[in-house]
């Protein structure tokens, strides 16, 4: 459908090529975007800094999955936040947005392109595998096509005899300089990854002009004031005098809302703060909301609570507790409900292996070592030497006869032993 829609979709040889080609397209005047997951984004980060330096509009989509490295590429997580914040070296203007559902993804993409072109900077949409791949039913008229398109100021010509040399990076009060597409009459300039003066002439080859560097860096970063003013601040959902405030970001919005329904039925007063615009951040507005909350719990899919740390860095506010998940599966409402109740009851959140998890670990061992010829049956907890154990009875898939026992650590999850009751044939099945 590319020709019909006026869109070019290109599969490049690697992530470096993708990022640089998208930036080049944005520089040339095309609305350009590219998408990747965490590993690919790691390779793109130097190029993203180039977009910040040459002030090229471009949109990146970073879909988080379980890491580090290849990790679990078919499972979800929210643990790339530090990487997205730290993309490329140095300070440069950029926007980071975390959409909350499928419909929001559509409008966020439109908004991202408008921001990129209006303010001449890179925009990163940070999603996750759950949001990027799950099916979702929406209303037929939820996605409108009459969306606003804002391309920013693009000059069509530059009368050099009248105005002098074109200053692509003019030091303006707004920080936004006149943009000319390649080939514009009279508007020749140099776009380079080195810092430069107003005409694009580099200031770091032979000598570094510190005053030019300072004013150029201030000019670039001035854009962020206008960007922040344009982005809508977050709003607190629910009763203002709630006993508990659940804080989330990105794709956790739906599951938090559903969990609140169940918590409300239990008699709790719960409200909800969901953050979408991560950079620039509405520090003042968020601080005012949080300091009036009685008890705050941050819900996110990461081990270290990356968003809670970012929240503290931006506002100085530390949430009271964390509800975390990092097994690759998304939150379901009961996960949030159970952990919130445990926190309110003063209980520690257990990381011990549950019976269901022990069954899953038994299935994994069987697939790897026993050629799927058996299955876990009865499971019970017993005492062990260094920790309690899950004793898993293993039976034949077809015969249902006892074939052996697995012992799995309740605390560590370690497979301590497999004890067959008789010698088994574990070669590849003919099926």
Where are these regions (language model features)?
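Short, structured coil segments at secondary-structure junctions
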Residues: 5, 54, 91, 292, ...
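A short acidic/small-residue loop/turn micro-motif
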Residues: 421-425
């Amino acid at each position: 459908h590319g020709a019909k829609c006026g869109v070019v979709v290109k599969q490049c040889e690697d992530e470096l090529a993708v990022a640089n080609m998208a930036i080049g397209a944005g520089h040339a005047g095309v609305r350009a975007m590219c998408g990747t997951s965490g590993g690919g984004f790691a390779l793109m980060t130097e190029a993203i800094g180039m977009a910040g330096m040459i002030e090229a509009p471009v949109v990146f989509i970073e879909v988080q999955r379980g890491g580090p490295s290849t990790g679990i590429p078919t499972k979800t997580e929210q643990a790339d936040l530090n990487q997205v914040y730290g993309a490329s070296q140095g300070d440069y203007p950029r926007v980071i947005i975390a959409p909350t559902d499928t419909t929001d993804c559509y409008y966020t993409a439109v908004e991202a392109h408008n921001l990129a072109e209006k303010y001449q900077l890179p925009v990163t949409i940070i999603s996750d595998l759950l949001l990027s791949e799950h099916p979702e039913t929406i209303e037929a008229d939820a996605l409108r096509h009459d969306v606003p398109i804002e391309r920013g100021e693009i000059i069509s010509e530059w009368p050099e005899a009248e105005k002098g040399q074109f200053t692509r990076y003019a030091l303006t009060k707004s920080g936004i300089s006149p943009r000319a597409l390649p080939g514009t009459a009279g508007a020749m300039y140099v776009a380079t990854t080195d810092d430069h003066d107003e005409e694009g002439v580099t200031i770091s080859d032979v000598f570094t002009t510190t005053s030019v560097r300072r004013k150029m860096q201030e000019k670039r970063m001035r854009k962020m004031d206008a960007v922040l003013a344009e982005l809508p601040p977050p709003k607190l959902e629910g009763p203002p005098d709630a006993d508990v405030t659940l804080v989330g970001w990105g794709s956790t919005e739906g599951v938090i809302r559903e969990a609140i329904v169940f918590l409300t039925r239990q008699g709790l007063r719960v409200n909800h703060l969901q953050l979408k615009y991560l950079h620039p951040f509405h520090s003042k507005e968020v601080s005012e909301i949080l300091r009036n909350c009685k008890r705050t719990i941050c819900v996110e899919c990461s081990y270290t609570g990356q968003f809670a740390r970012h929240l503290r860095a931006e506002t100085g506010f530390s949430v009271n507790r964390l509800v975390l998940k990092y097994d690759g599966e998304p939150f379901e409402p009961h996960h949030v409900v159970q952990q919130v109740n445990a926190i309110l009851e003063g209980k520690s959140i257990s990381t011990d292996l549950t019976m269901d998890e022990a069954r899953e670990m038994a299935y994994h061992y069987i697939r790897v070592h026993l050629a799927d010829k058996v299955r876990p049956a009865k499971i019970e907890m017993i005492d062990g030497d260094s920790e309690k154990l899950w004793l898993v009875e293993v039976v034949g898939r077809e015969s249902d006869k006892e074939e052996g026992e697995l012992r799995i650590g309740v605390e560590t999850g370690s497979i301590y032993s497999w004890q067959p009751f008789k010698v088994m044939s574990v070669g590849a099945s003919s099926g």
